[in-house]
């Protein structure tokens, strides 16, 4: 058993190994302040024969006992992971995945289990560090040490692992992961910060990552963990050389420069088949059919590497990309709004071969999403959901539930907008945006940011500014590097970086970066952010040309909502016993009534007259019956000594027989009678007298 305790960022960090989960290949218990996680790393000892991909699974297990809660719902136990848990798992997955050896294809599972959690301890960020420790404590091959840090920016000062209170006042909320040498993963949101502030934040994060890695190194020292050997299947170099000799550089370049994603993919596939066919014709006798069939995948990998090399050289040496653009060019953009009937707001944003349909639905306060996770139990009134159907890339796949990727992309686009959404006081509707990707060739999440902004303005949501997003790429070749603007899917796959940046004309609002190289330094980040700003401003110009400001009127299909206040002391009267009054009003007028703790009442419905009638009903419920008040009441009961008359909803007074103008026998339940209030007693009871109807 090994334990290490350190003071770090004003709180206590404790790392423990060898006490729990001892049958796991690698396990570590990590406690930061009042939050505790167990991270385990396990793997199969053998690779499935012929497997050529790395099956890594990262899970983040929420335990409600960690925050002293019992799960909601009927079953009362943890079920499928929440969106927040999936996002946490993705956050851990992204920085560790590139650090596994290239030829390691064993199945690996990393699980982070939360035992105790205090909001503000950023336990999901510590999951990155925990995963690094667990993998290094195991025999699983893993190249290096990685750590994660959360950064805030309050009053001009950067803060590592800000508290919940500090985050409320922070201009930046970002999670950064990296090695000792470089930042490898970034995710976060900000309040329109500048590119200079962003670079400073990343450099600050890198220094803090070094501090955490130093602690990891101290903990791992003297343990001498023996690692499994990566069973690399060897093929003769001559086998690969024979194959590569059949690929003509100029011909491959022409193939790469084929216009259009579908055409390019088709031409590349045909060229690859032709090269393989030539190889069989010329070299099959030399290598034998059995050897060729067994090792064919190595030739396919060699083709991919050659393709990657050719694309990268073309960019570095000729400033030319596979679709003919220069490195700084954005693909053609078209924007259209109001194209879908009946929806509350819609927009189609197309950038090259990537297309997003954004739609907005405005709902009642009761349409909010009620979160029930260990991270939050709040209500969410702005949601952005992202859908990526298989037809967007011309593929055939089963339509299952929402994928982790869809949750992650939607979350990023949502963060780009969330701090610019009007407050509940300014715009009381619940807002749901959906981005349906209709076509995809790179950066569909940033297209979603743009379509969402256009659709919000089309719906009449009073956002002050448009938000646009762009994805930047990077090609490193020896000591040279080139930053690419608006990357294609192929450039993302074969390049060294995917840096998504969203924002307004005034600054950055959301960002996400994944890096495959350790060469990303301050200079690279500055250049990428500068070019991202230039591109973002060009896209924003197009968007403002399409719709410069929110529409003045909402769609006729949007529910009508009216807001007013009642005294807090009257909330119970309006709700009624067991919600009786609210239910009655909702059914009577076909409306939804929502009452907040401060007495704010929101009434929504599709008929303006019914909404007004419901409001009048509520106001009558809380109206005071005063002496001298004259009402046209309804007879509710008839007794020998008089009748009981309802003058306002729920307000029934006694009209004694001595104060009747008409005979008692002439009254029946439901009759209308004009009355005046004679006396109001302390308990709220009141006495009436009948007034003669005027002819």
Swiss-Prot record:
CDD domains named among the record's database cross-references: KH-I_PNPase, RNase_PH_PNPase_1, RNase_PH_PNPase_2
EC number in record: 2.7.7.8
Keyword DNA damage: no
Example GO molecular function: magnesium ion binding
GO BP terms in the entry: mRNA catabolic process; RNA processing
Top-level division of the source organism's lineage: Bacteria
InterPro entries, per database record: ExoRNase_PH_dom1, ExoRNase_PH_dom2, ExoRNase_PH_dom2_sf, KH_dom, KH_dom_type_1, KH_dom_type_1_sf, NA-bd_OB-fold, PNPase
SMART domains assigned to the protein according to its UniProt record, in alphabetical order: KH, S1
Xref: Gene3D superfamilies: GHMP Kinase, N-terminal domain (3.30.230.70), K Homology domain, type 1 (3.30.1370.10), Nucleic acid-binding proteins (2.40.50.140)
A Gene Ontology cellular-component term: cytosol
Sequence similarity: Belongs to the polyribonucleotide nucleotidyltransferase family.
Designated name of the protein: Polyribonucleotide nucleotidyltransferase
Organism of origin: Petrotoga mobilis (strain DSM 10674 / SJ95)
